[in-house]
From Swiss-Prot:
Gene: ple2
Signal peptide: 1-22
Tissues showing expression: Goblet cells.
Pfam family, one: Antimicrobial12
Keyword Metal-binding in annotation: no
Positions annotated as propeptide: 48-68
Name by which UniProt lists this protein: Pleurocidin
Organism: Pseudopleuronectes americanus
An annotated GO cellular component: extracellular region
Role this protein plays: Antimicrobial peptide with potent activity against Gram-positive and Gram-negative bacteria. Activity against E.coli and B.subtilis. Weaker activity against L.mucor, s.marcescens and P.aeruginosa. May play a role in innate host defense.
Alphabetized UniProt keyword annotations: Antibiotic, Antimicrobial, Secreted, Signal
Compartments it resides in: Secreted
């Protein structure tokens, strides 16, 4: 019960504070900046692997059937 009450009080406090007060604005700007870099790195990593798979798919011609 104490945890629930504490959680609710902190949530109410966080929701009532405006982004310009107490440096919250700079915190959110920095978090967004970091998020953009992390997202770009993850996307680059994912697409890098995907391009290698596409290259292999082009190298192997699916129209050619070889029986050994």
């Amino acid at each position: 019960m104490k945890f629930t009450a504490t959680f609710l009080m902190i949530a109410i406090f966080v929701l009532m504070v405006e982004p310009g007060e107490c440096g919250w604005g700079s915190f959110f700007k920095k978090a967004a900046h970091v998020g953009k870099h992390v997202g770009k790195a993850a996307l680059t990593h994912y697409l890098g692997d995907k391009q290698e798979l596409n290259k292999r798919a082009v190298d192997e011609d699916p129209n050619v059937i070889v029986f050994e």
